[in-house]
Amino acid sequence: MAISTPSNGVSHVAKPLPNLKEVNKGIETDSEDRAFWWGALSEPLASLLEANHYTKEVQLHYLRWFYQWILPALGPRPLDGKPYYGSWITHDLSPFEYSLNWKEKSSKQTIRFTIEAVTKQSGTASDPINQLGAKEFLEAVSKDVPGMDLTRFNQFLEATNVPNDCVDDAIAKHPAHFPRSRVWIAFDLEHSGNLMAKSYFLPHWRAIQSGISANTIIGDTVKECNKADGSSYDGSLNAIESYLATFTRPEEAPQMGLLSNDCVAETPGSRLKVYFRSSADTLAKAKDMYNLGGRLKGPKMDASLKGISDFWYHLFGLDSSDPASDDKVCIGNHKCIFVYEMRSSQGSEPDIDVKFHIPMWQLGKTDGQISELLASWFESHGHPDLASRYKSDLGTAFPKHNITGKSVGTHTYISITHTPKTGLYMTMYLSPKLPEFYY
């Protein structure tokens, strides 16, 4: 077994990973940057793929693909404890995030990850705010991802980019505590060996520079996707905007933070996603935000509301028979995230699916406690195999994190929704804690 020693000096025994060992035999590390990222990220990925029953062939394919494409896209390695560019994805400033997707009606879990593509030009005079990294990466990797289409990606990138002659102004106005990120890219690693790419656009650079709100930038960009045949996102946008108008105090209003699309060819009913941050510290507030104050209705919404209620009661140990439990404050200062997945339609009614993201590192619970709560949840929803191994899987994937001890923050968010096809649908987002253990 391999012995790993993190920056805190405590040694941990890492589980042998035969597929990773096989991949390692066939590669020659050609740079210190690639060697650093591979050393930090390959073992968790290999462990998660193995634990979640991907075939050997598919595991080898994904590990080799990851080495070939993702490591260079992460850019130069950190130096002297500081990242090369300084963008981040997670609360602990890691530029990478894993996730594990669970569907109630499926026996398989899907591994995913998110990055921000960075180049040697990022942060230099050639590309001061990293507006080129994502495009360069996706154009290159698209040759190796069948079905990838960048039409809408390019449209959204242009809509949220800062004009070249205004970049200096944007930098001067940019608050020090704001993230430097421009575009995130995520991949779903399907068990078939096929990849699904998604892109996420942060509009805050453009908003700061132009004085136009992020809500307006994203709303206008979505409206530009309406079609001449009458299919549009107007019904969904109108429902969202009508709900936002009910907040009379700007500081209490949900804030739009991300616009997302799937990097595939557009089809009728193509989905777009908008992300809002909101102070949903009680279940009552979360449900109001989830259904846009009652604007989203029907059996599918009823099932979703029941699902998030049941999980909320389970997570916080509340009594579902006590009406007061819906108004009990359970989350601190950090805001929850609501994702409105809109599909184009011919009518005026909204066509929206919603996901609710809870900030797990803010709950006063260790990763071990969260793992045990999730295990009992999976057990009660027909997944005893996942329940029995979830905590140990995390401990194996992240041996430096001390999952069974007092670790906090490996779980970043957990999202939940419900669809007729999947039943309950949850994603556990996981930080590799790169600054803590590798910088």
Curated annotation (Swiss-Prot):
It is an enzyme of class 2 (transferase). Iso-A82775C is a precursor for the biosynthesis of the anticancer natural products chloropestolides A to E via a Diesls-Alder reaction with maldoxin. In the absence of the prenyltransferase iacE, siccayne accumulates instead of iso-A82775C and can also be condensed with maldoxin to produce chloropestolides H to K, which show also antibacterial and anticancer properties. This is Prenyltransferase iacE. One of its GO terms (biological process) is alkaloid metabolic process. It comes from the Eukaryota. InterPro entries: Aro_prenylTrfase, Aro_prenylTrfase_DMATS, DMATS-type_fun. It catalyses: siccayne + dimethylallyl diphosphate = pestalodiol + diphosphate. Transmembrane segments: none annotated. Belongs to the tryptophan dimethylallyltransferase family. Induction: Expression is co-regulated with the other genes from the iso-A82775C biosynthesis cluster and probably controlled by the cluster-specific transcription factors iacI and iacK. Substrate binds at W88, I89, E97, R112, K198, Y200, R271, K273, Y275. It holds the Pfam family Trp_DMAT. Prenyltransferase; part of the gene cluster that mediates the biosynthesis of iso-A82775C, a enylepoxycyclohexane and biosynthetic precursor of the chloropestolide anticancer natural products. Within the cluster, the prenyltransferase iacE prenylates siccayne to generate pestalodiol E, using dimethylallyl diphosphate (DMAPP) as cosubstrate. The probable oxidoreductase iacF is then involved in the epoxidation of pestalodiol F to pestalodiol F, which is further converted to pestalofone A by the short-chain dehydrogenase/reductase iacG. Its EC number is 2.5.1.-. GO terms for molecular function: transferase activity, transferring alkyl or aryl (other than methyl) groups. Keywords: Transferase. Disruption phenotype: Abolishes the production of iso-A82775C, but accumulates siccayne as well as chloropestolides H to K.
